[in-house]
């Protein structure tokens, strides 16, 4: 208390809720005022908390009177704030007293805490008083609009360019080139298509937004002491993390192990995090590599927590440049890092030696079995030796139930049993701190030593069943995880993508658990890549899409699902509609319109409960109400015949709701509902998880049709996201300040083209299927519909693109151009269209943050991919639709991190593919056409330089787009394969002969001919 005041009197006003407990009239205050020691003990405090007034006020028998202040001034230094001029109204200055003293004042009580704690009677467990006071409600996230100074000119330029394109096309149609109608007709058709495709691509970009998450508010709301959570235990929902892999030789197990380690060490409540790996190949190599990773995680995860390591992928951490001690405060960091680095090197040696170890073990044990069989055969058993198979053996001396090194019936890649192995059990619900002496080399005192649960899964595969590639594996993981952990949210990763920002998951939860988050089906993170060449020759970073298109879609109904780094709401994956108290309508999907509650009742259940969730939820009557509102919850024809799985659906829906801590939260759960510990796994639960990943489980169900990942397309990710948007769900694009996740991308030209081919083929499949956006429901917003329509249409642009790339060559060969003359009107329109395009590019760079070089690389690879992979995708898609020929793709090989002298060796490796032929043809034809055009103009008596200028500039512009392709074919130091020269020569000879045949030379130099 300030030294300015010698004494004071606290008197309470006679409010209706502050009346004397007896019938006695209010007593006057004593002359000396109310002292803290004179007040009675609080009715709910301990003996040491005697500094709190009685339940309804201070004074004798709770007398209530006007609050007054009696003070005596004491001289004080002029710098003391308490000497400020007092209010002349005579009212009590509440703020002043709250500032000057440590007392807490209110109607009916005053509190002097000791050391800012309450309830500490010497036995510990003290709780701060402010923790027991209800905190003001805070949003967990907010939208950050693009500044109008950027967005308004951007939209205006889109309108200007649209008008310019319209006028240009009108002029082109009304001014044909009568000397070359065929050339004019081809160009007109191409230009109309380009204008249409530009409109489809540009319109969804009109409303880009940014978002920001408040991690401090998330911690305060879910992990801080409160009246409903006095101990501050985490109230966050559970999260199931999926890792997908299929071939340990194309996807190195060391890469997968590093991904697993980064997930196990992420910053999320350990008891709420559950990690699964789906090994679709059923390989023992993957199984034993994950076992090695789990053993190393026992020291790696506590090390990351102790020293706040970033990133938590050990390979990326130890290979990153810079000072590793920067920002580290603990004196033992250098010693710990040196020891853990040595342990990681030994871990890598063990993992890399596993293939040889497994094979040597198999050879030794198979030799033993054959010896025993020969002994039995010698004893009279004639069939003993014939029954011995070349098995693959586990470390405990038993047969591996998955795929063997030498495939045999029931042990082949497409024919093996289900495997579920919980390698790390559920951690203890309470924090388990390390102690001095727990580890011989690391001091883990006061470090949480727990590790999240981890399970290895390999679904059953049998001949005669369609396994539906990655989508089938994801659905198997969804069902198994629902039985084992049933986290209401799921995060999926490819095996080569790892967590680069350990706070990224928390940022995603800010959106899912915020007000209105129950209508969000998934949070998509941008894909970031490492190991890309500095010039990004083949646009691997794809920043134009991830930072431009996807950010713009976030302002509509949400970004598309792009395969990895996506956090899902489990309930949305199950095919249910979102809770719909309002409908979003309008061009941008921002207009809120209330709807009939009966229309949205099917997706707004009351509550749920059950064993699988492990949380405190509603009773049996709530489950019965939920089942009544959701007849599909118990429909085996939709979800299968697992009763345990069906019961888990209501629990997952309930636990995924936001907190009911604000009147505007219409579909929430009470705070503190997820504080109870989870029951341990038992044998029956694990057996049920094995059952739901059997190959027959999906028979006569809607898995892959309306439930889970959707089957029937090689781009199952886009289709799955489209289905959820089509039901009215929204999605969010989460761009974190530090990259959330990182992965690898193919830097080899052939691998990159095959990757683009797979994506484009999936888009063609979407276009010819019922997932075409033209057939979408009215819940899909207009501009979002245009974006999905563009996904299905963009490969067809290749048909027009390759014709347009050949137009300059045809112009130079024929001596004509797409217009009769280079009319000023034509040049003006062309200039206006080009200028508006460049201005749009500059503004897009401004609001998206991409660089001009990245934009130009994207344009170049759009032409390269459009005339190769996209063209092949259209042909393959048409063959599938017309002839029913199925399309299969090989798994893209992931490069393991190695200490190589040249990290970009793959960039210079040339692997011939038929996809090279169309771009080679375009390049060769344009070069020959340039030579022909220049020769004709030079040797003509009346040179027509305008036609040469138009065709020549056009041809140079085409060749500029193919520069990365040509550079890639050169290899390194002239190591171009012979087949490239062969094809280039064949194309040149063919084009030359074709031109001579179509336009034979004559003696008329005046007509532009060349004397021969």
From Swiss-Prot:
Keywords from the UniProt entry: Cell wall biogenesis/degradation, Glycosyltransferase, Golgi apparatus, Membrane, Transferase, Transmembrane, Transmembrane helix
Membrane topology qualifier: Multi-pass membrane protein
Feature: compositional bias, Gly residues: 606-618
GO molecular function: cellulose synthase (UDP-forming) activity
Annotated catalytic residues: 280, 717
Location in or out of the cell: Golgi apparatus membrane
EC number(s) given by UniProt: 2.4.1.-
Listed transmembrane segments: 150-170, 180-200, 799-819, 825-845, 871-891, 914-934, 948-968, 978-998
Annotated InterPro entries: Cellulose_synth, Nucleotide-diphossugar_trans
Biased composition (Basic and acidic residues): 57-69
Role according to the record: Thought to be a Golgi-localized beta-glycan synthase that polymerize the backbones of noncellulosic polysaccharides (hemicelluloses) of plant cell wall.
Similarity annotation: Belongs to the glycosyltransferase 2 family. Plant cellulose synthase-like D subfamily.
Protein name: Putative cellulose synthase-like protein D5
